[in-house]
Amino acid sequence: MARNRDPFTQALASLRDRIHSGALAGGAPVIVQDEAQRLRLSTTPVREALARLSGEGLVERAASGGYVTVRFDATAARDRWAMHAHYVMIAVELNARALGPRRPPAPPFEPDRPIASANRLFSSLVCSAGNRVLWDAFLNVSGQLDLVRRYEAVLFDDLGDEARGLYAAYSRAIRPEFAEAVGRYHDRRMGAAGALAALVFGGAGPPDAGTGGEE
C-alpha cells in the first residue's frame, strides 16, 4: 500500500477494495483494530472510512456495535439494478432534451474489459447530464453493484458482444436505440439477481472478465 496518501484516503480505498473484491464477505464484521493494524494506521481514519462506506451502503452498524459489511441478497441486487437503470434513463432524457440528436462523446471501448467499458459509458452519460444530485445517486448505487458485477462472467458468456452492442447503439441514436439497449442490459441483470446474489454469498472466485469499476 502506497504511503503517499493521507490516512483517511488510504483506509477508504483499502476497505472499499476489500469489500468489492469479496475479501470482506457480505455480513462479515469489520474489526477496526484489525484493519488499523493491517494498514499500519491509527483507528481514527479507519473509523472515518467506515462512516463514509456506511453512507455509500457498503457497510452498516452492527447491533452489537461496530460495523458489518452489507449482505447483498436477491432483492437488494434487483432493486439496485432497477435504480441504476432509472438513473441512466434520466440521463438519456436530460441529454436528449439538451442536445437533441447529438450525443456526448463515448469513452474508449476496451474489448478485453467489457464490464468496465459498459460502466464507463453509463458513467460518462450520467456525468454529462450536468445534474449533481443525479450523479451522486448514480455513483452510490453503482458502487454497491460492484459487489455483484464481478460475478457476471460466471452467468453471461456474451459480455463482450453486449458491451459492443451498447456502444454501437449509442453511436447511432440515443433514442430509441440506445435507450432500448439500456433496458435490455438491465432487464437481464434484474432477472439474474438471485443467481448473482447467490454467487456473492458463496464467495466463488469469478473469472477475469474486465470487471474494473468506474474510472
Give the location of each predicted region.
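A ubiquitous short alpha-helical element
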Residues: 1, 50, 106-110, 126-130, ...
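Short leucine-rich amphipathic alpha-helices used at interfaces
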Residues: 17, 24, 48, 54-55, ...
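Short, hydrophobic secondary-structure boundary micro-motifs
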Residues: 26-28, 62, 103-104, 134-138, ...
